[in-house]
A protein has these predicted regions:
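N-terminal helix-turn-helix DNA-binding core of bacterial DNA-binding proteins
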Residues: 2-35
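Basic amphipathic alpha-helical segments that dock to polyanions
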Residues: 10, 29, 40-50
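Residues within the alpha-helical elements of helix-turn-helix
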Residues: 32, 70, 87
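Basic, amphipathic "hinge/linker" alpha-helix immediately C-terminal to the N-terminal HTH DNA-binding motif
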Residues: 59-77
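Amphipathic alpha-helical dimerization/coiled-coil segments
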Residues: 79-112
Length: 112
């Protein structure tokens, strides 16, 4: 199934926040990404409907197996590319921003 870059970004953000904070709610995603509550709410609904996340009665977000697989793949790419760009002399902030853009478009072969 083809998944959009924005969905990959949401899944990656949920993964990173869960590693940092334990429990993750939509408001945490709003604060991390700087998007509106409405746009995050719509995205979370789509991710839930497509079987990528679950939302419990308290609003906590959990990555389901398909969502976790995508999030871990994207996050791994992000870390690899950030490190690579920093090795080229790019500052950490710029390296992370550029990695976020590149992580979605490079092939598996390129990243091996």
């Amino acid at each position: 199934m083809q998944i959009h870059q924005s969905a990959e970004d949401y899944l990656e953000t949920i993964l990173m926040l869960s590693q940092r904070m334990g429990k993750v709610r939509s408001i945490d995603v709003v604060n991390e990404l700087g998007f509106t509550k409405a746009s995050v709410s719509i995205a979370m609904k789509k991710l839930r409907e497509n079987g990528y996340i679950a939302v419990d009665g308290e609003g906590n977000l959990t990555l389901l197996a398909p969502g976790r697989e995508i999030a871990e793949r994207i996050y791994s790419r992000h870390r690899l590319l950030t490190h690579f760009f920093m090795q080229l002399g790019v500052d950490e902030k710029t390296a992370a921003e550029d990695a976020c853009k590149a992580e979605h478009i490079l092939s598996e072969q390129t990243l091996e």
